[in-house]
Amino acid sequence: MRYIDLRSDTVTQPTDAMRQCMLHAEVGDDVYGEDPGVNALEAYGADLLGKEAALFVPSGTMSNLLAVMSHCQRGEGAVLGSAAHIYRYEAQGSAVLGSVALQPVPMQADGSLALADVRAAIAPDDVHFTPTRLVCLENTHNGKVLPLPYLREMRELVDEHGLQLHLDGARLFNAVVASGHTVRELVAPFDSVSICLSKGLGAPVGSLLVGSHAFIARARRLRKMVGGGMRQAGILAQAGLFALQQHVVRLADDHRRARQLAEGLAALPGIRLDLAQVQTNMVFLQLTSGESAPLLAFMKARGILFSGYGELRLVTHLQIHDDDIEEVIDAFTEYLGA
């Protein structure tokens, strides 16, 4: 059975064209800095984002870990959102491995951190407190795009306090496509950026961490320390390069399908769904009955998968097509008896 898998854009699979690029990738030893594919990907990624250097790593979790540990010494602190991926879904690696104190502040509905909350969370220059060194933002967060004026305001705030600013940009290019801004514009306020290649962009493995030469040199040493040094990684890097060059513009199709799905579901009885919150490739909804387990079982029996932890999440991606959207709407209609 072919599943319509809307659980996440992490389930994307390489296209035939991407597989051909991987098949013919030239490789070397990346720990020695001799893999042509990795070197090409890192150079392309750094230039694309307007930064000095980049580092290819196996995962977004590792990329964020290296970023926090490169910015902060042991015993220093980072301010971030209470619902941020770094804080909630990365096993507190920055604290466990880096001894960095993570200071959460409330996350707003649009994925932002209130400037007043961040300012209040910055530790005073006093021996009783952990020195704050870093602020982390996430764009997109739950499919929502942080506005460029807000990013610039946050840059001004961190500059006032002599801090660094990191972006978890796992789905950064969704924000680029949705906002109409260039990627350089969206990342200009940040000292470092993590981008995921294996979500909507469709590569099988990997993330890029970008920043200054000095920052990436520190991150490269830490990558080796935590086991992220790879050898003939050009096969994977070639897929990432293909993704950045070929799959960014097509993210608009994912957004269009998410909107089509959201509008179809919002019209059904028994569903609570705020269309204003559907900005990229994620649709969040609730059943007015409050009981999602029977729905998930019903859908799975029909070859449809999505996440349901209280609020239901459906994510469009490279392997979701127009016919799939119609099939999902029809299945919801049947289940709800509409």
UniProtKB/Swiss-Prot annotation:
Cofactor(s) demanded: pyridoxal 5'-phosphate
Keyword annotations: Lyase, Pyridoxal phosphate
Any one Gene Ontology cellular component term annotated for this protein: cytosol
GO MF annotation list: L-allo-threonine aldolase activity
The EC number(s) this enzyme carries: 4.1.2.49
Pfam families, sorted: Beta_elim_lyase (PF01212)
Catalytic activity: L-allo-threonine = acetaldehyde + glycine
Taxonomy, superkingdom: Bacteria
GO biological process, one term: glycine biosynthetic process
InterPro entries assigned to the protein according to its UniProt record, in alphabetical order: ArAA_b-elim_lyase/Thr_aldolase, Low_specificity_L-TA-like, PyrdxlP-dep_Trfase, PyrdxlP-dep_Trfase_major, PyrdxlP-dep_Trfase_small
Outcome of mutating residue 199 to A/C: Loss of activity
Disulfide links within the chain: none
Modified residues (N6-(pyridoxal phosphate)lysine): 199
Effect on the protein upon substituting residue 51 to A: No loss of activity
Assembly with partners or alone: Homotetramer.
Function in brief: Stereospecifically catalyzes the interconversion of L-allo-threonine and glycine.
Stored NCBIfam families: GntG_guanitoxin, PRK10534.1
UniProt cross-references to PANTHER family, sorted A to Z: L-THREONINE ALDOLASE (PTHR48097:SF9), L-THREONINE ALDOLASE-RELATED (PTHR48097)
Family to which the UniProt record says this protein belongs: Belongs to the threonine aldolase family.
Name this protein carries in UniProt: L-allo-threonine aldolase
Source species of the chain: Aeromonas jandaei
Gene name for this UniProt entry: ltaA
